[in-house]
């Protein structure tokens, strides 16, 4: 039995499909999306970013239980989303200050959990870069930061989705074999830390615990893990989390993300859905940049739709309802916020 306040419960239900699975689309990228569109189009224009997000939202949210957006470029996309699609809203500033050690997080100054809720948001999402092996003087800042967000979300009774992105302060290439060997332990440490009640997190938005480019049978070159080792890392992460968790696509291709979710399904991992971003829509950027709105719309109605609906099928096969970590739906006791 778990007690959950009505605002948080209602938010989680609005973000989930009829099976209680969070089959969500992510397009809250800001700086990186601006760069990608600029490279494809040759010009930089805020409206291009807004229009791209709006078209993605319009065409793909009929196949998503929810969409993750930002209020900097995403307002037209929020308005364009399908009626039945829930809304997660980003609260953190994009990127981090590279001149300061520790990749410290920061919030958008004119935003709050209350304002996100007033704007129709069903959940607050925060991304934080996290190296569990960095000095305490860096990590304590992040811990206190997240405690404040958790308290804010509790106060206005809105779900808190936390996305910890792990890194290593000394191994700076996150795509390297060296980092691939470190990654499982980093992801496990982040789950252990941020599942603590003090943070008030409702759903963890997690990286998969291995880099599939280095998994035996998937790797084209060097191998960091056998398939059995990779499966063990998935299972251990699943068992470690007392909270519902979903997977993020982390910039991999649609094909690779599908293989990743198939792998999780094969090993009975208790994940409750995905927040899939670039794996779904990134190939549409080149189409948009070179051929414009109508060509992108056509791409979204064909390849984009195929990317998201084939992922939905995989979720049907393996994802579990968000309340599974608490037992059955009947074990969730909804209470009014005091």
From Swiss-Prot:
Pathway: Carbohydrate metabolism; D-tagatose 6-phosphate degradation; D-glyceraldehyde 3-phosphate and glycerone phosphate from D-tagatose 6-phosphate: step 2/2. Its EC number is 4.1.2.40. Keywords: Lactose metabolism, Lyase. Pfam families: DeoC. PANTHER family: SULFOFRUCTOSEPHOSPHATE ALDOLASE. Belongs to the aldolase LacD family. This is Tagatose 1,6-diphosphate aldolase. It comes from Listeria monocytogenes serotype 4b (strain CLIP80459). The lineage of its organism: Bacteria, Bacillati, Bacillota, Bacilli, Bacillales.
